[in-house]
Amino acid sequence: MQNIGFIGLGNMGAPMAENLLKAGHQVKVFDLNQAVCEKLAQQGASVCANLEELAQGVSCIITMLPAGEHVRSVYLGTHQGDKGLLDLVAENSLLIDSSTIDPQSARLVGEEAAKRGLDFVDAPVSGGVAGAHAATLTFIVGGSDNAFARAETILKDMGKNIFHAGQAGDGQMGKICNNLMLGILMSGTCEALNLGIDNGLDPTVLSNIMLQSSGRNWALELYNPCPGVMENAPASRGYQPGFMSKLMLKDLGLGLDAAAKSQSSVPMGALARNLYAFHNAAGNEELDFSSLFEFYAKNNNESVG
């Protein structure tokens, strides 16, 4: 068992930290939300007031942060002179960033960590809040072979599938590709279901037809976006997230940014991003990303192409 620091206790980070505690690790936590910190303290975590306190006496730190700028400031420090983790942790520490951010930020942190003799991996996750609670997440890891081997022993306490995608930044690229496809698949699934309903088909029957046909996909099988078709899906719970629409828009934006840098053609990804941008602008950003189904239902007589 290890002494681990955990920074970022949101919908994903909090249950991930809980699973580390359940696995027997000593866990120190830091987050601006004191309520969630206190909840974890009741389960045995030590609450820290700042990064300096958290970095003392730990061999590994895990971060789960909103965006690239937060990751850069936490690891590299701020323009105001605040030190980052790279200047606070002990020699030979392991640093794991499970945020979903741009690959360039992950590579920058990885390069700076290597200069200091530190092991860093970017390890974004797939599996959502349910996977975080159940410790069944998929981790997509970028980093050296040695850093991956060290990280894998800890990631297994929070997830079921751990993939080594390549060097620092490659974990982010793998996650971006996955979520680009997820956004496209969800958009297409919403579109096909809406078309069938408009033409008199029962959505449950249509879903079952497609599940046994070539249109079968993850959204149909585990996350049906039509209310009432799948009992435990967000669609049948008023689109309570889950994975919020604003986060899907963010990830699709990361995909388009990456495509621009590599001059890759992503017309379907661009369309999916535009659909989510319209959907979010209508006040749906806090709803689950499968709520895009409602966008189609409300725009039947309008062109959305």
Feature names for model-found ranges:
Residues M1-M64, L88, N92-S93, V129, ...:
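NAD(P)+-binding Rossmann beta1-loop-alpha1 motif at the extreme N-terminus of oxidoreductases
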Residues I4, V74, T100-L180:
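Rossmann-fold dinucleotide-binding core
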Residues M16-A17, V109, I154, L195:
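Hydrophobic residues within alpha-helices
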Residues V27, V47, D119-V121, I162, ...:
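Hydrophobic beta-strand scaffold residues
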Residues L51-D119:
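Rossmann-fold NAD(P) dinucleotide-binding segment
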Residues D170-L271, L275-N300:
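Helical "substrate-binding/catalytic lid" subdomain
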